[in-house]
Amino acid sequence: MEDKKKIIFSGIKPSGDLTLGNYLGAIKNWTKLQEEYDCYFCVVDLHAITVKQLPADLRRRTLEVLAIYIASGINPEENTLFIQSHVPAHSEASWLLTCNSYMGELSRMTQYKDKSKKMGDSIGAGLFNYPVLMAADILLYNADLVPVGKDQMQHLELARDIGTRFNNSYSKTFTIPEGYVPKEGAKIMDLQDPSKKMSKSDANPNGFILIMDEPNVIRKKISRAVTDSIGIVNYTDEQPGVKNLINILCAIKGYTPDEVVKMYDGKGYAEFKNDVAEAIVEELAPVQEKVKALLGDKKALEEIYKKGAEKANYAAMKTLRKMQKKIGLIPR
């Protein structure tokens, strides 16, 4: 009998248009996981509304993120692709877990602390409870592994703590997940300020490349990317702008940083930047084409997310019913 595949859960918020960082740092890696694991890839729209969204934009981006998953090579026949709000168990489980969470542990979350410093008392309760919803997302599917970046590791630790606490209080209910850090997978930094991660919420549009950016826009943004006055392509922390561009090229082409440094020995930044830009354009062109085709066939896309929600709902409801029974709620 063949071993049961381990379960992976991951998702992206449709709170902004997706960037090259989302693609190279997450989605491209997910495509490599689908053979080996039973994958649940979600568009986490309920997380997006912790900050007010324009309804039409949220709907557009939710479908676009789903289309990007598929266009990047994630097979909807082999994986469970769905929209978070289409599986009501996420919201229900989140409340049950909220009642097993502590104010202290939630207020210690770095992202919440950073945002509350800026926003004070006007910070939304949704941002405070965000990590509990994330815990529900993961625990509902009994995920073994969760691909996470460093910025989400603290939230995953909390999910583990909440899951363990529930198991200890009510008997074994959840698999306690591990963080999955892929061997490959670059952390792509801001093109204008390489000390921070490339982010779709950046105020300066030259700092990020969107997956759906036109080729000429990509070329322009890379040509304006911050480098330095050294003029030599080196992979070193002293040249963070150049290092970031090397990481982008390596993530796309499969080179090692040393190989890139050798390739551009004696060559200037102009040629190097030009090659990085062309590599990005070449990588994203087929993805963009497929995304446009998928968004042009809303019926086919709807079929995919409805089928995905059905499959996700089946798994999530099994866990939710266990939770309800153990807590003492009367089955409906």
From Swiss-Prot:
Motif 'KMSKS' region: positions: 197-201
Keywords: Aminoacyl-tRNA synthetase, ATP-binding, Cytoplasm, Ligase, Nucleotide-binding, Protein biosynthesis
Cell location: Cytoplasm
Listed GO CC annotations: cytosol
PROSITE patterns: AA_TRNA_LIGASE_I (PS00178)
Single biological process term from Gene Ontology: tryptophanyl-tRNA aminoacylation
CDD domains: TrpRS_core
InterPro entries reported in the protein's UniProt record: aa-tRNA-synth_I_CS, aa-tRNA-synth_Ic, Rossmann-like_a/b/a_fold, Trp-tRNA-ligase, Trp-tRNA-ligase_bac-type, Trp-tRNA_synthetase
Chain location of the short sequence motif 'HIGH' region per the record: 14-22
Main location: cytoplasm
Reactions that this protein is recorded to catalyse: tRNA(Trp) + L-tryptophan + ATP = L-tryptophyl-tRNA(Trp) + AMP + diphosphate + H(+)
Binding-site residues, L-tryptophan: D137
EC number: 6.1.1.2
Domain of life of the source: Bacteria
Binding positions for ATP per the UniProt entry: K13, P14, S15, G21, N22, G149, K150, D151, I188, K197, M198, S199, K200, S201
GO molecular function, one term: tryptophan-tRNA ligase activity
Subunit description: Homodimer.
Function: Catalyzes the attachment of tryptophan to tRNA(Trp).
Similarity field: Belongs to the class-I aminoacyl-tRNA synthetase family.
Protein name (Swiss-Prot/TrEMBL): Tryptophan--tRNA ligase
